[in-house]
């Protein structure tokens, strides 16, 4: 039987909810990068992040502010960046984000990048 090495990164919010969603996203990604690199060094083959990992968990509410946090898959900022890390480390990365599938249509989803 083959062995599969998996990793999970979960952390608290780097900033606060009064900040703009793009600023929160940038801080969260910056905080994840060292752990992505560590996972790559340790030979992780499948790396997962927590739900809506670039933002606070706002999903139970209806605050329109968070619409600005939505990104496209596969062409959004976070997905494109994670494609680079997946390629660099030859790993699959599960990228849970708030997706804008089309104007006005939003999903709490995950892109799977290999």
Regions found by a protein language model. Name each.
Residues 1-114:
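Hydrophobic structural segments
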């Amino acid at each position: 039987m083959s062995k599969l090495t998996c990793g999970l990164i979960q952390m608290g919010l780097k900033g606060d909810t009064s900040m703009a969603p793009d600023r929160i996203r940038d801080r969260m990604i910056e905080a994840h990068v060292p752990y992505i690199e560590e996972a790559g060094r340790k030979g992780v083959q499948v790396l997962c992040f927590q739900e809506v990992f670039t933002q606070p968990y706002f999903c139970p509410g209806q605050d329109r502010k968070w619409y600005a946090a939505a990104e496209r898959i596969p062409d959004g900022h976070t997905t494109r960046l994670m494609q680079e890390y997946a390629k660099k480390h030859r790993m699959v990365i599960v990228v849970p984000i708030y997706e804008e599938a089309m104007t006005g249509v939003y999903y709490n989803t995950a892109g799977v990048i290999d």
